[in-house]
Amino acid sequence: MPITKNQSFIKPKQERSQKRFDEVIKTAEFIYMSDDYDLTVQDIAKISGLKRPSIYKFFPSNESLLEAISVKHTNKLLLLIKKNFKSVNYKNTSELIKILIDVIAIYLTNNSPLSNLIFTDHSKKLIKDELLELLNSVSNYNELKIKYSLSIIISCLEEAFMKEGNISPQQIAETKKACLHYLVN
């Protein structure tokens, strides 16, 4: 799991505390996915059976809860991308970009509505940093070209997903065209 800097929540060190932390996240995800989304520490305490001070120990605000969920899902997405890259074993950057776009689109669609939290500024930076390092290790393109390609991918997929709640095959194809056109020119 990538280390995140400047996060607003406190990751526990002890196993017992980690279980409480995970329970809070699980409950927060459940509430977030409800139709009448209103994520509050009071509701989490009520549903999870944990005391509010225990929750505030890890999450000083509602925003810190959302950030923790965002980081969790961003890390799951990054792990999935890395697994797909390893299983394919391509050294061709264009092919890796196509796989990257497909994996992100599938993850977003399969994990909605929680997946919209991947588009927080913090998560987008985490995604770009991790993928830049990964693609730089196998690519013959310069770092700036890859960095901007990742920005194109994230912007296109974010636009499509936030507008529609899913990503159509046409939007995936257009994202690939835009990114690959930039990359090769």
Q: For each of these PLM feature ranges, what is it?
A:
Residues 119-147, 173, 177:
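Amphipathic alpha-helical packing segments from all-alpha helical-bundle domains
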Residues 31-64, 68:
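Helix-turn-helix
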Residues 68, 82-109:
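Hydrophobic alpha-helical connector segments
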Residues 63-76, 118:
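Alpha-helical DNA-contacting segments of helix-turn-helix folds
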Residues 98-125, 155-159:
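Amphipathic alpha-helical segments used for helix-helix packing
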Residues 25, 42, 172, 181-185:
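Karyopherin-beta/Importin-beta family HEAT-repeat alpha-solenoid scaffold
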Residues 146, 150-169, 181-185:
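Amphipathic C-terminal alpha-helical segment
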Residues 1-35, 43-47:
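Basic, helix-initiating cap at the start of DNA-binding domains
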